[in-house]
Swiss-Prot record:
Entry GO terms, CC: extracellular region
Cell location: Secreted
Classification via InterPro entries: Alpha-L-AF_C, Glyco_hydro_b, Glycoside_hydrolase_SF
Similarity annotation: Belongs to the glycosyl hydrolase 51 family.
Phylogenetic classification of the source organism: Eukaryota, Fungi, Dikarya, Ascomycota, Pezizomycotina
Molecular function per GO: alpha-L-arabinofuranosidase activity
Name under which the protein is recorded: Probable alpha-L-arabinofuranosidase C
Glycosylation sites: N152, N181, N269
Protein species of origin: Aspergillus niger (strain ATCC MYA-4892 / CBS 513.88 / FGSC A1513)
Pathway(s) it belongs to: Glycan metabolism; L-arabinan degradation
Amino acid sequence: MTTFTKLSDQDAPSISIHPARRLSKINPNIYAGFTEHMGRCIYGGIYDPGNSLSDENGFRKDVLEALKELNIPVVRYPGGNFMATYHWIDGVGPKEKRPARPELAWLGTETNQFGTDEFLKWCEVLGTEPYFCLNFGTGTLDEALAWVEYCNGTKDTYYANLRRKNGREEPYNVKYWALGNETWGPWQVEQMTKEAYAHKAYQWAKALKLLDPSLILILCGQDGTASWDYYTLKQCLLPAHSPLSTSTVPLIDMHSIHLYTSSPSHLPNVTAPLAAERAIEITSSLIDLARIENGVPPDQHRPTICFDEWNVWDPIRAEGSKGAEESYTLSDALAVAVFLNVFVRKSKDLGMACIAQSVNVISPLMTSKDGITKQTTYWPLYLFSKYMRGWTISVHLSCASYEGETSPKWVRGVKDTPWLDVSATLGEDGYVNVAVVNIHEEKDIRSSIDGPSGTVSVFTVTGERVQACNMNGKEEVAVTESTWEAREQFVFPKHSLTLLRWKLA
């Protein structure tokens, strides 16, 4: 949580850090990823058999190494819009017997050479947990139950035995399952009304939890501010009666929301992620309202928010039908850093956040047949995932604000837009970590900082211009390391992310 006092441009900025005020534990899953059968994310991205850079499984070793550096705790799969016509059974068993299918989300052909077992093996190699999305378009409840049985079944049953036949004796124990993806969208195969979706989601959730009560089920929301979100929460945050007792059990564990932002102008681009902060606040209130109206006991699990698609994406610059291969700038990297600051500030309400996507498709990593490129957006992800963990702590910021146009326009009307965007954490290791984005394109900002003492480690992400880019063989944006003596004021460079880190005395 960051409180804010607005100053004039002539007043001296200040930042006060309060490590003793631990506000909420940060769920490591806010640094989750996403891989979809879209463009070159899977084929030619994480899976590239025959390439000299791939291992015996066909997994790109350079991609694995770069993703391991991000400490990704969970990866969502296999979609996305792709999921609405995907049938998991096509992607298991001998590869020569797997059918190729027309793919309707991105108008391609799905060969099914990479499926459930390959993805789960890849997760084990990466050291991450899987998060599966169920087919709410052309899929059936029987198909969904069979997939859970295939992944998690321990008994002598058909799909558990099919998994064993395919070479995996022990269950995978997949915990996270989404009840569809963007089923409200007109681009979806089998678009649904909120009434139809809520009824279907509740009934599926009952059956899934009967099969495996340990599942963590994620409801399909919109952007957190829509009537869809309120209606589905109200209808689905109803406890179900257990068939074996008189008690009731909650069915929904998280509510999913999505947001992509972009603007060709720097300042609207870097302030746009503040829309995510307002969306989290509104969704949190809708969860509470649904629980109150439904009479949910206060000691029963309160669902958290699963922000399972977020990123900077300009669909004109990077068309989805052409693989959505973005070439990210420093401005985009700073927007990603503001997103991450939002997630740290709102950690109390967040159970997960998945950047879309992990490789090649609107991604911090781009592959070629000869290697990988770490885009500008890789570096804020690296710093936050490495250091911004533990507890969110209280910060008070005093500085001037950006007063221009935002995208969306309503952001400036409901959120403060200070020149410095700040979050702070206290790690399990006793270190205080403060992330500060100076969104100003032209002005370094000198600020006093109340909290640190002695020598402070400084990590900086910046470049000569906001349009600096790491593609085409250039590396114009990376992390630099330095130190700062805390008795002095600190100068935050123009258009930069700075992470300050010191041991709490």
